[in-house]
């Protein structure tokens, strides 16, 4: 059976974090089961973009520092790595993101090494999905002796939730990520990409920062929520299943996790997941706001019914009053659906991946309710629905 440790932790105080994390790892078998002196240990953080740690958009720098210090005390060489989403002037903003989140400072003070996946080279792997024959993942993932996943507990405007399973998308360096969004335009097919990564990049541990979570329209434009939790497991899907239960969401309602279930990346049956730590049952997060696009599982499996019942849907729209004209949305759109000058979105080619909303650091891309009946009629006219 899979085990998920859930710890109560109310602040990013270093010693308190270390105590809770060490206790959780003991409940999973102890650090000696996972790392040894001299090991090169890569901490795969969530560094979606140049956001501060207090924004709840990235794994908090003090959370990363706590894990790094524990590993350094055990004689490990510690790397901190990721590749941010989006593009500024045709270049992924990862270097800027490491500074904005406070990782550079933490790494320097803890004797850790920053690994910018955009500039460290790639390794070719063979994915199991049918999207393409080859996939290129960041080289440090394979150079490290041990890889530990440090996801952030967040909602996602397109995928409903992002956690341990989805955090691995940052293993794809730089602007290659946009290509995969284009190849896998919906959450279910995107989940195939994530499963491919998990089957090629072997993560030993998953330690989720849920001390301060993000609710609402995550993964960057949502609101902070004091979840006061740290979740730990060797099983990414079991961890996500437990986290979703806290939100009152069934794992089957989050399509990006379907491929992980089908390929047995982990356990998704709550009856086969042991809960340990400060909690012996899964606690509920009260008044936690889910994304506007969230639908109950009763509607989820009937696409025709969704188009009739879900009369209004959310669609991205640029608020020009908030827009800084940085063009991250324009350069990050895999379908090139956003006009550089007017910031108008061509909904005829938009695949609703929400990259524009996800990667705007100024919350200028908003999700608006649209008359979906008009969209259906337009789609029929254009031959989109047959």
Residue ranges and their predicted role:
Residues 1-326, 330-343, 347, 351, ...:
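N-terminal and secondary-structure boundary signal
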């Amino acid at each position: 059976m899979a085990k998920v440790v859930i710890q109560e932790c109310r602040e990013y105080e270093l010693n308190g974090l270390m105590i809770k994390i060490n206790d959780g790892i003991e409940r999973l078998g102890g650090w000696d089961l996972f790392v040894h002196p001299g090991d090169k240990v890569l901490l795969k953080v969530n560094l979606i973009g140049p956001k501060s740690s207090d924004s709840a958009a990235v794994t908090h720098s003090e959370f990363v520092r706590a894990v790094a210090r524990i590993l350094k005390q055990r004689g490990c060489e510690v790397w901190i790595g990721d590749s941010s989403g989006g593009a500024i002037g045709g270049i992924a903003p990862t270097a800027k993101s490491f500074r904005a989140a406070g990782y550079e400072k933490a790494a320097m003070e803890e004797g850790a090494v920053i690994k910018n996946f955009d500039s460290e080279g790639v390794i070719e792997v063979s994915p199991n999905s049918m999207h393409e024959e080859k996939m290129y993942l960041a080289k440090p993932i394979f150079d490290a002796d041990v890889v530990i996943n440090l996801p952030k507990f967040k909602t996602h405007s397109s995928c409903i939730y992002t956690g341990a399973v989805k955090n691995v998308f940052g293993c794809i360096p730089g602007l290659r990520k946009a290509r995969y969004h284009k190849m896998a335009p919906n959450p279910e097919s995107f989940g195939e990409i994530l499963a491919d990564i998990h089957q090629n990049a072997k993560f030993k541990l998953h330690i989720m920062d849920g001390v301060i979570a993000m609710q609402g329209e995550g993964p960057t434009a949502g609101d902070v929520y004091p979840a006061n939790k740290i979740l730990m497991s060797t099983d990414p899907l079991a961890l996500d299943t437990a986290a979703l239960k806290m939100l009152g969401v069934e794992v089957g309602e989050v399509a990006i996790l379907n491929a992980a279930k089908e390929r047995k990346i982990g356990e998704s049956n709550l009856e086969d997941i042991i809960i340990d730590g400060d909690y012996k049952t899964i606690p509920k997060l009260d008044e936690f706001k889910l994304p506007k696009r969230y639908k109950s599982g009763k509607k989820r499996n009937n696409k025709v019914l969704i188009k009739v019942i879900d009369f209004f849907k959310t669609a991205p729209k640029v608020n020009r009053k908030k827009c800084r004209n940085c063009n991250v949305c324009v350069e990050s759109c895999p379908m090139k659906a956003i006009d550089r000058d007017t910031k108008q979105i061509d909904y005829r080619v938009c695949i609703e991946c929400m990259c524009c909303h996800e990667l705007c650091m100024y919350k200028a891309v908003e999700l608006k309710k649209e008359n979906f009946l008009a969209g259906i009629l337009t789609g029929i006219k254009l031959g989109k629905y047959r």
